[in-house]
From Swiss-Prot:
It comes from the Bacteria. One of its GO terms (molecular function) is flavin adenine dinucleotide binding. The gene is thyX. Pfam families: Thy1. FAD binds at residues 55, 78-80, 86, 172-174, 178. HAMAP family: ThyX. This is Flavin-dependent thymidylate synthase. Pathway: Pyrimidine metabolism; dTTP biosynthesis.
Length: 228
């Protein structure tokens, strides 16, 4: 399944190892017992989450294919417990694909981590026009440099942070939950929130018990609980 995100981005689950039962079996291996009844297995997952026994969830592993603006990817890569492989602009030419927002935000004075949408239509349109003009000019210069024979590894330095990139992300469920705590939250940048919310949908579908327990006992954000 592919989730369309932002104007040109996407999120795909391309591989997965384990599910709720993988965490159950990992937790019970210490005393030689495996899967029991579904009710007891679910209760065990809830017990593990409530009491902070998180290592069994490392046996559930997801691999995602992500297309996102570079500024989103750079925030994503700060989650270091996981494996990343990204498309290289040293060896490939960038396509004419950039994130063009449909709204403009301004900072909240009381909370520097939050930003709210601008209602002033004149200000909004002026800002969006400036953004689009800057992007178009940067890409024009990039193409001119390539046509002059400048190496891709040098020509790329003029490209904006709104350029789309693609990468694979392999992550275990424990680290994925940490990602959701930080990015499925109103303090995170709006663009990465959109990816986090779709990851949460996949997590809920593939590991419903673990996701339910996570929301009940370990989730520290606000967007998955009706936050703004």
């Amino acid at each position: 399944m592919e989730y369309k995100i932002l104007d040109k981005g996407f999120l795909r689950l391309v591989d997965m190892m384990g599910d709720d039962y993988a965490a159950v079996k990992a937790a019970r291996v210490s005393y030689g017992k495996g899967i029991k009844t579904p009710e007891k297995d679910k209760n065990l997952i809830f017990y593990l989450m409530e009491h902070g026994h998180e290592t069994p969830f490392e046996h559930i592993v997801f691999t995602f294919h992500v297309k996102a603006p570079i500024f989103v990817a750079r925030q994503w890569f700060r989650h270091r417990i996981g494996s990343f492989n990204e498309a290289s602009l040293r060896y490939t030419e960038l396509k004419d694909e950039f994130y063009i927002p449909d709204h403009v935000r301004k900072n909240v004075v009381e909370d520097k981590q939050k930003a709210i949408k601008v209602d002033d239509e004149q200000l909004k349109q002026k800002a969006l026009d400036l953004i689009e003009s800057s992007i178009e000019n940067s890409y024009k210069v990039y193409k001119e440099l390539l046509e002059m024979g400048v190496a891709r590894e040098m020509a790329r330095i003029v490209l904006p942070m709104s350029s789309y990139t693609q990468f694979y992300w392999t992550v275990n469920a424990r680290s994925l939950m940490n990602f959701l705590n930080l990015r499925a939250d109103s303090h995170a940048q709006w663009e990465i929130q959109q990816y986090a919310l779709n990851i949460a949908n996949i997590f809920k579908e593939k590991c419903p018990w673990t996701f339910e327990a996570f929301l009940k006992f370990a989730y520290k954000g606000d967007l998955l609980k009706g936050g703004e």
